[in-house]
Every structure is written in C-alpha cells, then in structure tokens.
C-alpha cells in the first residue's frame, strides 16, 4: 500500500510517500499546470493508494481526479493538523512529512467529505447568499441617495409607493444615472434570487429531513436545506453542544489558575450557516415562548447582538435533536420544553 502525505497548494503540491511493504520513502514536488501531478498519480493506478491533505480551497479538481483513478483521499482538519506539529520550523517538505506521519500513526484528524451532488447543491445556496448580500448593498446605496434628497422611508422604500417616490426624486445628471442603474440592478437581482429561491424550495421538498426542520418556526427552505447539507449525518455529533461548536456558535473560553472567562463566539465553521441561523432566530423568537423569554433576558443584561446569537445556538441544537429523533417541532417541544445540549 502507498500512503502519501500531501501539502497542497494552488499551483503545486509537496508529497511524502511511503510504501508500507518495503518501507521506502519518496519525497518530491509536483507541479499542477504542467500535468506532473496527474502523471504521478496515474502511474499508481491499480495499486492501493491513500492520500492525506489538509482541508483547503480550490482542491476540487484534485479530489475528482483521485476518485476517477480509484485512489482513496482523506481530508483532515487543518487547525488540528497544525496543533499536532512539534517543530516550530515550517516548510512544505516538513508539512508533507507531518501529514504522512499522522496517517501512519492513526492520528490523522479526518473530516467528513460530502458527495459531489451535495457540494453542487451547496453552490446553489452559496450563490443565492452572495446575490442577497449584493442586493443589500444596492438597496443601501439607493437608501443613501434618498436620504440625500431628504426622504427616509427605510423598508417602505421598497414598496410600490416607495419605489415611485424614489424614481420621481429630482436628481442631476450622473446622480440620476446612478439611481437608474442601481434600480435596474435591483430588478435583475430580485429576478435572479426569485429563480434561485424556487430551486431551493424544489431541493428542500425532495428531502424529508428538510421538511421536518421546516416545522420549526423561523426555519424555511433555505435554512433547513443549508443546515442538512452543512451538518451531514447527525451521527457525527454525539451531543448538541458539539453541533454548536462545529458551527462556531460557542463562546471562546480561557481558563487558567482556577479562573474561567468567556469571550465572543469562536466563528469557526460555516459563516453562511451562522448568518442564516441568526436570521432564522429573529423570526423564531416571535413564535416560540421559550426562545422569546431567553432572548428578552439576555437582551436586558447585554444587548440584542449576543441575544440573537444565543437564540441561534439554541435553534441549531433544537434542529439537531429534531433530526436525531426524527421528531417535528410540535413533538419535540412537547417532550422537551428546554432544548437539550
């Protein structure tokens, strides 16, 4: 069997490979664009090969190539791999050898890797989220133009009447051109986001677990689908608290000398999922008494931002238990008035 530690970069990779039968070690650098890496792995076809890399961006082509060749790929948690480094000197060669050592010692922090189909649907959600953020930027610019003309409508600016007022505001030359272009962009973005929303609803309807999550107040097709595709199998997480930690919703902790202090949330994990959960939490507190009480208490002590995050964390844990126990919101809430951690 060939075991390969790979320090992956956009244009090249450094490898450390060992043959478990002979003990022979081979190290080298493989360029990507010239096809050197492809030729190297092609030469290993027909043999049992396991490759380990850190979780990095822009590696999808490499993952697909190894799958086509029949090689096994393990993707590891980059932060944990770095924490296991003993030496302070960092080079590509040492990084590749370090990954190889973790693979050989059975200490490689392997991550769950979603299927290509799941990754593709994730692109749908990510594309929608980016367009929503872009639409928000366009709306903010239009609000600024209206404020410069003494018009302050906030959300009412996007009603039929508000839009008419905005279009009729007296503006000169390039200011009027900017307004016209921004309105055209807004219309186009609304159309594109609407199309993506329909695609998200269609994907959500095909998945029973997403429909189950949508029984919880505040959880719609976007949040439910993103949650299922981000979390993967719930069996990966023995406890709800681990889900909150995985999503970066647990406060940072510093404990030393018997003193324990907590800071802001870690913000590790999927940024889009955290954003969606916070947005869903703001709706959930309007319909769920327990969440509303918790939100009110923390908001009174601190302010609304940490209160929203707290509700998002509780919501994430609730959704986890709904999936684990295959229970709807009504069934789960009746059994557990307090969300389990």
Q: Predicted segment positions?
A:
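A detector of single, family-specific signature residues
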Residues: 1-341
